[in-house]
Amino acid sequence: MQPTGPEGSVTSDMPEKGPHAQEPRKLEARLTDADRLYRAFVASGAGATLVLITLIGVFLLIGALPALRTAGLSFLTTQPWAPDGQPPKFGVAAMMFGTFVSAAVAMVITVPVAVCTSLFINEYAPRSLRRGLTSLVDLMAAIPSLIFAIWGLFLLVPLLQPIEDWAVAQFGGWMPLMEASATGGSLFNAGLIIACMAIPITTSIIREVLAQAPRHECEGALALGGTRWGMITAVILPFGRSGIVGGSMLGLGRALGETLAATLILSIAFEIKPRILENGGITVASGIAIEFRDAQELGLSALMAAGLALFLVTFAINFLAALVANRSRPGAGA
Amino acid sequence: MTAPETKALPSTSGTGERRPDTDAGAGPPRKVPPRRRPRAWRWTDMMETAGSLVAAFFLTWLLFTRLLPFRVMPVAFAVVWYALFLPIHWLVTKDGQGRPAAKDRLVTVLIGTGAMFAFAPIVFVIGYVGYRGLKVLRPNFFTETMQIVGPLSKATEGGALHSIIGTLEQLALATAIAVPLGVLTAVYLSEIQGPLARPVRLVADAMTALPSIVAGLFVYSLLIKPHLWLQSGILGSLALAILMLPTVTITAEQVLRVVPGSLREAALALGAPYWRSVLLVVLPTARAGLATAVILGMARVVGETAPVLMTTGGTTVLNTNPFSGHQDNLPLFVFTQIRSSQETQVERAWGGALILLVVVLLLFVLARIAGSAGSGRRRARFPGRGGQRRGR
Amino acid sequence: MTVPDVQHTRPMPEADARPAGGVLEGVDVSCWFGSRKVLEGVGIKMDAGVVTALIGPSGCGKSTFLRTLNRMHELVPIATLAGSVLLDGDDIYGAGLRLTEVRRRIGMVFQKPNPFPAMTIADNVAAGLKLTGTKVRDRDELIEASLRRAGLWNEVRNRLDAPAGGLSGGQQQRLCIARSLAVSPDVLLMDEPCSALDPTSTRRIEETILELKDQVTIVIVTHNMQQAQRVSQHCAFFLAAENEPGRVVEQGPTEQIFSDPEDPRTADYVNGRFG
């Protein structure tokens, strides 16, 4: 790229006749010194963020290495947690199972409720209530999980326990997985509480996506004489499908990382228990919260390995959510 | 084009709100026809619904008292009642108005029910926490600590001063760490868009998935376990800041991106260097959104228990120095008290929970106010005299 | 009319003095966006005391050319250019002039009014001073003078502390003009300043332009033939053939361009036969 000086060219009113083999000139002094300083300063801030965040991942990985080396592949299949024992015996199988089961219970409740609530706020609620309900959902999303957890522990679980006992008594004999020697501190109940926390955040995201459904198409559907439900199935749900998936995934990420509900509700048991109404279970997050105090050298490393595993799972889910959400384009999908 | 469109022009959007009598105010008093409010439902619809409800109720009653061997439980009764109501309602509307209408009606009921399940917890949570919290909250709750409180003390004795102070200090420190860094990163992402932008955005996105307990574990195993720094408030702030940073960065970037490019161009066209245009035009224009982002970030971490559980240590005495010595905070206070076997301790936990709830509510309201104050600052237009400047 | 001194400013002209403002000259300017050439070999001299209008159909490169005149063109990351732009004989792209100095001396008014929404009316006028770090003796006086020059003073004198967003579109555009004038530019570039405004506001802006033309060199891009005739004395007609960069087909005194153009394409365009 060669700079072309003004001396190299001639002004002409009829330029199409002149020869024009110009090259773009290189510009100088785009930035003042102060601007260079500003750029360097801001870039260093961004760099610090990058370094800090990367450091966490790297540090977790390094910290987890001794435990992973000790346990090998059995880390994924072992249920008990005794990393500081002789010989050390530990793995994330029970924790992961508990995490996934409680999250699954939570999502089975969360997704339909969140979709219903979003549709209710956007399409069914009176106009005057809409803003208030939206704020309420956003507010709910801000309430600390601790409060949901103690509320569940003291109000919801005692309330549900007789019903669960009744269900176990009625169905326990002949339906698989419904037996339980004792109820209350079960993965099901933990999942239920987690659902209460996940519903607001999921609703808030889904509602926002569904609200962006093209109004003229909705009105088109209504103008054809369709019912409200007809409009929802024809326009809004197809439009918001990926938003629903994305929002649910984010809710799932929240549910997987939830610590308090599981710590307070579950009767701790490091084993895989398919009978979800029965007491006992553990999740990764609550396992870390409970075990860290007594953890020795290898124990801490094992906890970091568990934390890393959890992080990888939540990261993968977030990533998928972003992928799905980005694919959503108005009018796409039938 | 014209910014005041929204308030100057009569609303052209919400077509439903225009009323026939709005422009009659100025004219001579004439007979205004009664205002009609179109309704989507009719009285017969109500009757159908009510009838279905009654029919389902008696059917359920019949089932439970005469036909089934189940013990009668109110909850089960309600569930069966609801389950029977749906098909009855469907059949009734289908008979009267045809299949699509029946389906629509059925779905309306289902969606309403679903929404109820979402809104019920909030009412019950706030109500229950308020009820139990108010029982123990006395003024001394804000002035005393748990230092001299024994297992036999009454629930109204002692207080959470040490936890409140701890929460405030830790929150302030976490904000002081996360917000400048986050906003700086956001400025980089949106205004400079340099080569670091892609990796930074990638890791920030990834870190929003970081479970809060893992942030605590990170600080614990990096600093506390190797005895580099003992458990203290600042370490709790660090863990909270790690949780805040990606959220603040991403929200702030979104807020900055909304600032119209024409404003940046206008600033640059006046001869401003980049840094001044960002500092004096872009950031002030986005300040409402930035404030909202910051406050919501604070609301998000103020109730986080898992990370502070591992990092601040927890204590029953007042420690105003966040940099050394164990420090308590509200979530930790609630968590330790609620797990106690003493009834009075548990009672006290609800007091802490109520305060925490109020703090979150306050932050939320603050965020709303900051957000709505943003677009077009509405200040009292006072009739100043020509050329005189005020309010500087 | 009194205009206070600002750093770097030459004294303001008396009523009968030679017109103030800088002489701007584009010399053989070509522009690219990436590898696409959008403008080729444009040379226009924009004299002080003369309003120069750039006309032509959409997409012919007039706005691009205008943006090269105060180095706004390079804000687009893939934009490049060749040739040079001389302000009173100095190349604004050369090493001698600082970028920010160039933009301060060559102001710009945009198509859509863009007052800073976070500032009051007065702060908006004085924004350029703050943004360039310029100190003035009497800020209030400068604000008043700038607003007077833009013809907005009487409308806003009682609400200088009100947010700028509360003004009408035409008032906002004149506020933007006042904002540009407050840093005492030598040249004022206007990129279709009236295209977003109603006819009344348009007329007010045109009056403002005519009042300003002896104080500052004005270059205006417009789609409105009548406007070009009303406000400008010099006129350049841009045209771009399909898939070719834009060029200046013809330029000269406005009267001649509109009454007796040399090029048939110019005649077609100014008589509304295409474009």
Annotated model-derived regions:
Chain B
Residues 74-85, 157-188:
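Transmembrane alpha-helix signature in integral membrane proteins
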Residues 104-109, 181-219, 247-254, 380-392:
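Cytoplasmic-entry segments and transmembrane alpha-helices of multi-pass inner-membrane transporters
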Residues 175-194, 198-201, 232-269, 273-281, ...:
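Membrane-cytosol interface at the C-terminal ends of specific transmembrane alpha-helices
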Residues 205-242:
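Generic hydrophobic transmembrane alpha-helix motif, especially the helices
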Residues 256-257, 268, 336-392:
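C-terminal transmembrane helix and the adjacent membrane-cytosol boundary/short C-terminal tail
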Residues 274-312:
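Transmembrane alpha-helices
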Residues 308-358:
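Interhelical loop and adjacent transmembrane-helix boundary motif
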